[in-house]
Amino acid sequence: MRIGTLEYINSVLTDELEIPYAFMEWQDDPPEAYFVGEYSEGDTPEEDGCQEITFIIDGFTRGSWLSLEKYKQKIEQNIERTAILASGAGVAVFYGNASQVPTGDADLKRIQINLTIKEFKNGR
């Protein structure tokens, strides 16, 4: 996954959708609900330069399930988009699915949101 794509996802989630989000780990005191992202790349890019990536956003709260579901709905309704990054590479983002994940802690709630990201190299 390119740095530009990570920066793009961060900008969409935090600036546009106003979701409390960080990549890989939350480093400050956590708000009531917050989200952390990570990714898994496919084996190799296709001949056309397209690489498909699974981007996982985990949401956590000690509050209500409803707060996580509201953020999930916001992501689901607003995340699908395409863009040309500053590098000239293209990116397409698609909502996949979501599921509640047991944490083993009765107070801590977790939701996993799966996105599919397609990166297209710019020919450079």
Language-model segments: residues:
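Small/polar-rich, solvent-exposed N-terminal microdomains that initiate assembly or binding
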Residues: 1-45, 73, 77, 82-87
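Short, charged interaction patches at domain edges and termini
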Residues: 1-11, 40-52, 91-124
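Residues that form or flank phosphate/diphosphate-binding pockets in enzymes
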Residues: 30-31, 66, 123
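A broad, low-specificity signal marking well-ordered, structured residues that form hydrophobic/aromatic
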Residues: 33-35, 55, 113
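Extracellular/virion structural assembly segments
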Residues: 48, 60-80
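Active-site-adjacent structural patch at catalytic or cofactor/ligand-binding sites
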Residues: 52-59
